[in-house]
Amino acid sequence: MRTGGRPGRVNAVRVIAGLAVVALTATACAGEQVTGELQTVGEVAGLPVTHFESGLKDDAAKPDVRAEGATDAVEDRLALASIADVTDYWDEQMPEHFGEKFEHVDKLMSYDPEGEAQEVCGTSTRDMALNAFYCPPEDLVAWDRGVLLPLLREKFGDMAVAAVLAHEFGHAVQTRLGEKAGIDGGTSTIVKEQQADCFTGSYMRWIAEDKSKYFELSTSDGVNEVLGALFLIRDAPGSHANEQGAHGSGFDRTYAVQLGFEEGAKRCAEIDKTEVDERITEVPFKNATDQAQQGQAPITGGTMVHVQRSLDQAFSATGVDPPQIVEGDGTCQQGRSTPPVSYCEQNNEVHIDLTTLEKIGQPADQVGELTGKNSPDAGLGDFAVFSEVASRYVQGIQKGVGAPTEGGQAGLRTACLVGAWAKFANNPDSGSTLYLSPGDLDEAIAELLQPRSLLAADINGHRVANGFARIEALRNGYLEGSSVCTETYK
């Protein structure tokens, strides 16, 4: 994030007053620290929230699929099952939505980049670590079983393998659909990637509806893991969406996956340059200073003054007495505490533990994330911290207007209002003392996916169970503004 700007008052955040206050008994005693209990709330794109271990079904048959170089390793077994399954999916979807038969992918290849070098699609496998790809000239899908798939399984579980290969099959589908998906030789990479991510989401919905012979996917942790896996493989902050090879920011990638999960494969094929240009958030750094700092502001008391001012400006139209951000140990002397950031009702203050927040706010080590060798000093970035602080600040705003502050809907409304604040801070005419930098929205999503995150938690620190709903709430606030927060999360 960047500091600066002029004082201003913009009606960017409109909280509807007069909401009925839900009377819930608080169990926290004086000074009690409340842990992040999970809450199941609502649905996931029309499906019930389910809780079970996702992955291969116990009774799944051995797939009748062969791939060059495949071994009996669990990663290859998962890959072959994934390919059999996503092929079944497209055998069904292509005739139904596009009026044609799905021609199966011609070649499949498994390789270990640390093993014997092989040439595939004009490149040595030694140079293709951490990769899975579709090669149009050879109609081939290949995957790195030695580094990438083990890393994905370790971090996100078996469904991450299915998600990554489904994405590559999405590119094969594009090649077959051609003009039916608006794809030709001049189509930009980012449009192709957004479509492929969307196709992945539509396939995951099919599994979640229990239509797969091979896999089962819960709509809580299972969907969370799929989103986390695709979020991991995102472009670096400051990348431009129009660059050749751009895959999109984490914010943009998760949006496309959720779009497919919600609206299906036919909608994915409608994604075009006009749509992508209107909503894509991946932009380069605005100046040399921002690039040199990689968009990171120090987590200091001085920076928190800017956070306070920006939040006050954004929510001034509510007429609510703004909570004050106070340095300390991040706890309240009385009532609920959710360190390292707590909203203290008795004095309308947000207490922060700056030492802990400084560690969280260290720049992310994206290369380390991808290689599984994350630096011990790496954090999530400055906006991960600022969004956490904002999540407790808006407890005071919601309380001030009489909105419920406990329960799952309150947690989602919180994430939505943080997104609305980010929208305010991204508006150069808002007068905000803080402005978004490239990568800030990804830092917020990274924070949302943390097990300790308060970003989609109610006043007690109880967070919503499914990451799909958490990310969707943040995105709704950012794209639509605050009115959608109170209209959607009542």
What residues fall within each predicted segment?
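C-terminal motif of bacterial Sec signal peptides marking the signal peptidase cleavage site
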Residues: 25-28
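Short pre-active-site segment immediately N-terminal to the catalytic Zn-binding motif
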Residues: 146-163, 186-190, 360-388, 402-408
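Catalytic zinc-binding patch centered on the HExxH motif and its immediate surroundings
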Residues: 113-142, 327-351, 358-366
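Pan-zinc metallopeptidase signature
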Residues: 52-57, 234-322, 454-490
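Short helix/loop segments within enzyme catalytic domains
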Residues: 81, 93-95, 191-193, 197-235, ...
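Acidic helix-start/capping segments at beta-turn-to-alpha-helix junctions
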Residues: 67-68, 72, 79-85, 97-121, ...
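Bacterial signal peptide processing site
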Residues: 30-33
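Catalytic Zn2+-binding segment of zinc metalloproteases
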Residues: 169-184, 202, 207-208, 392-406, ...
